[in-house]
Amino acid sequence: MQQTKKLTQSDIIIAVMSGPFLQRGEPALISKWYRTKMALANGVDLVVELPYVFATQKAETFANGAISILNALRVSEICFGSEDGQIENFYNTISIQKNEEETFNCLVKQFMDAGNSYAKATSDAFSHILTSEKNIDMSQPNNILGFQYMKAILSQNSSIQAQTIKRFASHYHDETFNDQHIASATSIRKQLFSEEGSFTTIEPFLPQATTSLLANYKQNYGILHNWEQYFSFFKYRLMTMSPGDLRHIYEIEEGLEHRILSKIQNSSSFYSFMEALKTKRYTWTRLQRACTHILTNTTKEDIRSANIEQHAPYIRLLGMSQKGQTYLSKNKKKIELPILTHTKTFDHVALDIEKKANSVYFSIMHEPLRTQLLKQDITHHPIRYDETTTKFL
């Protein structure tokens, strides 16, 4: 956050944040409302939600949704972390892919026909057409997402300028703490769910407000969310589904339904299920996203009806600082998408899917807490934060 402000000299910071389920295809550790508080306490001025129909997708769709929201909010610059750290290299890579598009697409098909996943085939295709050091490594996850952000800016004819910050010390998929002060989200999650894990062990790697809110959520609700807590419900869902039922679920294709129904029979945990399910053809993340859609009963027809090829259909405002509120007031008439401060009255397929995902997310809570949280999520107004007093209003 500090590097972003320094690099962009921004007046305000806007964060587009996933809701209950993440792009990796797993439940968020804590609710979006607690994560909104974390963002506001650490310098963000506006927090808006990336709808489920974008948030649980491949990088290209994820980026398109995020950029369409930021474009509607009339931001001038975006800033993303990357393994490369040089924005010029992203522009070079985009230019080369555009010039070599026919060759690139043929290579992707060739590598997929050899049994590789789409992600691996794409990475290998890039390695064939990119020969200069002034290009990015498209096997790295943050480079991939940054590349898609920039492609989305171009495809949407946006005036947004892009900046990138190099990630140091910790890589996206690192499962252990490799540095005294910097850790990946993956390693922090793994530590929290390990037998020896505690909030004390992650304190050196997180802002104090973030650690406090994590501990507060665990104290108030008794849990931190991960896939294992949903496994019983997930397995029940699959045990009551036929291959035909499963084929209707979004991202279930190429006969994957038969493999899923076969492997669930003898799986006693989500991890053991995933270990049995994974193949060269499908990445772990891709399979987790498919599992998320099974869990939330998100069908191919749901996604088609949401019409996500264009742009986000609305902006759900989750939180704002005093500066953020002033910015919205000044620019509200220029913002073309509807801004939702609650979801009681707005009607859209994407929002129906969002509500369903929230219901599933809170399903592991005990009653009456579960019903209370679901009701609050619909009626919850944006969290307000006074950055001068550092108090929530």
Curated annotation (Swiss-Prot):
E.C. code: 6.3.4.-
Compartments reported by the entry:
Cytoplasm
Which residues of the sequence carry a binding annotation for ATP? G81, N142, R167
Q: Which InterPro entries match?
A: Rossmann-like_a/b/a_fold (IPR014729), tRNA(Met)_cyd_acetate_ligase (IPR008513)
Pfam families associated with the record: HIGH_NTase1 (PF05636)
Task: Please provide the record's keywords in A-Z order.
Answer: ATP-binding, Cytoplasm, Ligase, Nucleotide-binding, RNA-binding, tRNA processing, tRNA-binding
GO annotation, biological process: tRNA modification
Report the catalytic activity: cytidine(34) in elongator tRNA(Met) + acetate + ATP = N(4)-acetylcytidine(34) in elongator tRNA(Met) + AMP + diphosphate
Per the record, its GO cellular-component terms are: cytoplasm
GO MF annotation list: ATP binding; ligase activity, forming carbon-nitrogen bonds; tRNA binding
Q: Which family does it belong to?
A: Belongs to the TmcAL family.
Q: Which PANTHER family match?
A: TRNA(MET) CYTIDINE ACETATE LIGASE
| UniProt xrefs under HAMAP family | TmcAL
User: Could you tell me what this protein does?
Assistant: Catalyzes the formation of N(4)-acetylcytidine (ac(4)C) at the wobble position of elongator tRNA(Met), using acetate and ATP as substrates. First activates an acetate ion to form acetyladenylate (Ac-AMP) and then transfers the acetyl group to tRNA to form ac(4)C34.
Name used for this protein in its record: tRNA(Met) cytidine acetate ligase
Q: Which organism is it from?
A: Bacillus cereus (strain ATCC 14579 / DSM 31 / CCUG 7414 / JCM 2152 / NBRC 15305 / NCIMB 9373 / NCTC 2599 / NRRL B-3711)
Which gene name belongs to this protein? tmcAL
